[in-house]
Each structure stands twice: as structure tokens, then as C-alpha cells.
Amino acid sequence: IYYTFDSFFCSPRMENGVLGNALEGVHVEEEEGEKTEEESLVENNDNVDEEAREELREQVYDAMGEKEESKKTEGMSLSKPETAKEQESEMEKGGREDMDISEPTEELPEKVALTPDQLTETSEEAEGAAAPEGLNEAEVTSGKSEQEAADAEKGKSVSGTDVQEEHKEQVEEKQGEVIVRIEKPTEASEEQPGTTLGKDNTAVEVEAEPVDATAKPVDVGGHEPKEQMATSGNEPGKAVLNQQLVGQDVPPVEESPMVTTEAAEVGSEVSEKSEQEATVVSNDGAVNGLSAAGDQASVDPQPSAERVTETKGGSELEEVRAELAPSQEAKLPIEESEGAGDGVETKVAQGVTEKSPEDKVKIAANEETQEREEQMKEGEETEGSEEEDKENDKAEEETPNDSVLENKSLPENEEEEIGNLELAWDMLDLAKIIFKRQETKEAQLYAAQAHLKLGEVSVESQNYIQAVEEFQACLSLQEQYLEAHDRLLAETHYQLGLAYGYNSQYDEAVAQFSKSIEVIEKRMAVLNEQMKEAEGSSTEYEKEIEELKELLPEIREKIEDAKESQRSGNVAELALKATLVGSSTSGFTPSGGGSSVSTIASRKPADGASSSNCVTDISHLVRKKRKPEEESPRKDDAKKAKQEPEVNGGSGDAVPSGNEVSENMEEAENQTESRAAMEGTVEAGATVESTAC
């Protein structure tokens, strides 16, 4: 497992260095020690024999058996775990982040579609084609096996998870950009420069010869392609790689023997595969990027591969970029092809500086969404302002007018007044209780004054019965402690007379006013006597006498008013009795009214009125009967005198007892007459209908 992850993370970075430098023409500087060591290993490939190759195959088979046992215990996937897939994709994304390539790419919409079955078939063909390669293949594998063993031992100290975390951070920062970065190998890649990984977790280590820093840029007119590794499975070199990717299931492998076939074929089949490559790419429209990346990983820069990259044609470069662009466009198809057992992801070798059209479309869509959001915000602001205006209008409509406020203020003032009266009542009642508890004359007189004020409050509250009670309580206390000619008694009698008058008790009111006058007269007599006795200082008595004399006319007027009210009350009683008598005698009105109406109804047909005009005549008759109600009773005195005998049945010549009584009787008669007129109109309508029929 350790070797699997180690080779897993190192191979994409090596591929970045090779393919990126080939496309851009820029070479990565590496230490001189590594160059010399790698060159020496390449030279030693000539001394490798067939026995070394067989030993390496046995080691691979042993590693595969160990992998199967570890799979059973750990429950991991034989082909490739999902976690390894995600790590690989993230590693490859991170490897292409900072790659600076100025040439634009052409987009190919078609996706990678090579299945594991096809890879298996091509791997079988590749085995047959790899047999005649002979010594060159053996030499390459033997040299690589030695270097790979040394590198594998060195790589044990390197943690694959650290590299994974590093690339994860890079992928998260620039996930949507199609940029490939040439990144110098980390410690893991420096220690294991030749380690590559097949798709099915097969660790393939080859000797990577560093590219010269002064290498020339790509020759556009060349015909020797490195693109041969990206063509379809019909080519032998690719079939060998597919066998390497699919045929081996165990990741912890130190060397893959099938890599040698590709390395040997690079020099011999350059021209043939360049032609086949152009045709296959043009026909398919989209090359299997996964297999292309796997081939590039397995055949890392050897001298022959370096020559291929330097002489690659411009048309083939465009095809490489074209096949790399779709892999960035659709991550999902690539991941599906990985799950099917295809080769290493193609994203490692992407040399793109400009954003793909999909990214441009996404950017345009983001701009459109931002513009829409801004428009929505502006619309919300305008709607908010409109809502505020509506709320302000509603508030203005809800604000009451001045007249309404005044009308509301009136009840409030009344409530305040009522509140003040209630407060005064409470305070006076409390004072009354306090003074009554004291038995002194002064306290009792204060209690009497409290009763007097409580009576006045009751009068203001129109509670006349309560006022009468309070005045009587005050009067009883004053009579005990005051003299008969005291002015306080006169005042109490006067207030009591007013209360009786307001309560329509005119007899009692007249009596109280009379007593008040008597008290005042007594006071005046006493003052005259005192004035005669005090001959020197009579001015004070004279002033008081004058004041009392001024009060007498007012009290007498109150007495007269009470008497008149009493008389009017009597007249009102008589009027009510008369109305009651009129209502009781209204039983005679239907006959009299019916006779008068019948005579009128009999006259109309005599005038030759047609039955069609009867309806209009009814309305005319009703109007005539309503006129006495609308006219004032004073103007109809003559009519009343004529109609009284008819309505009252000859008993309307009664002699009135007085002018007022006669007027009241006339009003009662007018009411009875109006009732009779209404009843007569109803009967007239009935008679007219009968005649019309």
C-alpha cells in the first residue's frame, strides 16, 4: 500500500515536467548529480539480459499475491479504491495549477470512452507485439529495475499522504481553472524520480532523464510524435501500456516489465505511428486521455523520448491540447472511466493557459446572476420606498381632523369635570365625617357647611334627591347651633328651595323660599335695633341691611317662578287629562269621519270621474287631509270651531275655565282631529276601490 500511494503521487508530477516542457519548450533545472546518475543508468541498459527481466516478473507476481491477501484483510478494492481515485484526481489537479503555457487550446466536446474490455484486448495484442523487441526491451527493464529497487528503498521514508494533502490545498484554491503548473518534484519525487503508476494501482518505475535546461522549443514542422501514446488501442505501443494498466491488479509493484516494450518501440515506430496517430485522432474526435496520460507516465524522458518531444509537429501539439481540454470540462466522465479501470488521468498533462469555453460560460453566467441580483435589490428598494409611501399615506388618512379631535376633547373634558366633582365629593364627605366626630359647636357648624357643599355638588351632578337630603342635614345642624335670624339659615333655605324646584316639587320650593325671606326680614329687624342702639357706628349695619334688601327681590322672583311652574304643571296635568279624554272618545271618530269621507267619495263619482282617475283622486284626498296637520293651530281657529261639533258629536261647545285651559283643549282637539283624518283617508280608499270595481 505504501508503494502504491508513493508511486501514485510521484508519477503525475514527473509527467507534468515532461509533457509541460515538451509543449512549452522550457526545461526544468535539476541537480547535476541526478543527471549524471540517470545518464549512467540509461547507458547501463545495454548490459541487461533476459534473466533480469524474468526475475522482475516473478517479483511482480509475488507483489500481486501479497496485494490480494492485504485486500481481504483490509476490505479495500482490488482495482482502485474510491479514495485513491479522489486522491489521484486532486493530485493531478494540483499539479496543473501553476503551469504557464501561452498557447490556447482547442476544445473537443467528445469524452473519453475507452472501456476496460478494450484495454484488456489491446493488452493481449501488445504482448504478442512486444515479443520481437528482443534485447532493447530487456536492457531497458533491467536498468530500470535496478534504479527502481534503489528508489523504492529510498521512498519508504516519504509519506504519500503528505503529498496528497499538499495537492488538495492547491486544488481547493483553483479548482475551476484549466491551468497546468510545472512543479519541481518534492522530496518524494526527487528520491523516486523513476516511479510511475498505472491506473489499476500498478507502480511502474522508469528512469526519468532530466531535460536539458537549454532545450529548444517544439519544432512545429516535425513529424516524430510523442502523441503516439495518446492514440487508440490499435497501436502496439499503446496496447503495451494498456496491458500494463489493466492486466496488473496489485499496486505495490517496484517495476513493470511491460514498460520496456514502449521504450523500445519509440525509436523504431516513430514515423509509422505518427501517421496512424493523425488519422486516429481526426476520426475519433476525442482521444482517450486516460491512456495518453498513462503512456506518458510509463515512458518518461529517455533519450529517444526526448528526441520525440523536440521534433513533435504543431498539428499534433494542437491535438494533444485538444484531447486534454475535454478532461477539464467533464470531471464526471473521467472519474467514471477511472472506475472502469482505464489509464492514468489525463489532467496531469494539460497545458492550458486560457480558460476553456465552459469556464467562460460559467463566468458569464455568474455575471448575469450578479446583475440579476443587483436588479432584484434595486426592485426591492423601490418596492420598499413605495410601501413606505403607502404607509405614510395611510398614517395621514388615519390622523383625525381637528374637528374630530375637538369632538373627542369634549368627552375628555366632561370626564375631567366628573372626576373633579367626584374628587370634591370624596373630600367633602371625609371632612363631614371628621367634623361630626367632634362635639364642639364650631366643628358641628363646619360639618353643616360640609353638608351644604355636598348638596351643591349633587345639584351640579343633577342628583336632586341627594342634594335635598344634604341640605336638610345641614339645616338641622344649623338650627341647633344658630339663631333664627342668622343669614346661614337663609342661605340653606334658599338652596333647599332650588333643589325642590329642580326636582319639580314647587310647593316645597315656594315654602323654602318663603322661609328664607322670613329669616332675612328677621335679620333686618335685628340690625335696625342694633343700629338704633349703636348711634355712633351705624354704617356697618346699614350696609348689611342694603345687601339683605337686594336679596329679597331675587328670592321673591324665585317664589313667583315656582308658583308659575306649579300652575303650568297643573295646566299640563289638565292637558294630559284632556288628551286622555280625547283618546277615550276617539271611538266616535270613525263614524263621523266615515260619514264625511263617504260624502266626499260620493261626490266624486257624481262629477263624472272615471274609474281610471280614482287612484289619482285618492292621492289628492290624502293630501287635503294632511293640510290641517301641517298648518299651525292658530291659523285654523275658525276651522276648529266648525269641526269641533262634528268630531265631539255636538259636545264641543263646552265653556273653557280659562285661556290656558282652552288652548290646551284646542291642542287636544287638533290631535284627535288628525287621528280622525287619517282613519277617514283609509276608509275613503276602501270606498273608492269599491266604487271603482
UniProtKB/Swiss-Prot annotation:
One of its GO terms (cellular component) is nucleoplasm. Keywords: Acetylation, Coiled coil, Cytoplasm, Isopeptide bond, Nucleus, Phosphoprotein, Repeat, TPR repeat, Ubl conjugation. Its main location: cytoplasm. One of its GO terms (biological process) is CENP-A containing chromatin assembly. Residues 54-74, 82-99, 145-156, 164-187, 307-322, 627-645 have a biased composition (Basic and acidic residues). A motif (Nuclear localization signal) lies at residues 622-628. Belongs to the NASP family. This is Nuclear autoantigenic sperm protein. It comes from Oryctolagus cuniculus. The gene is NASP.
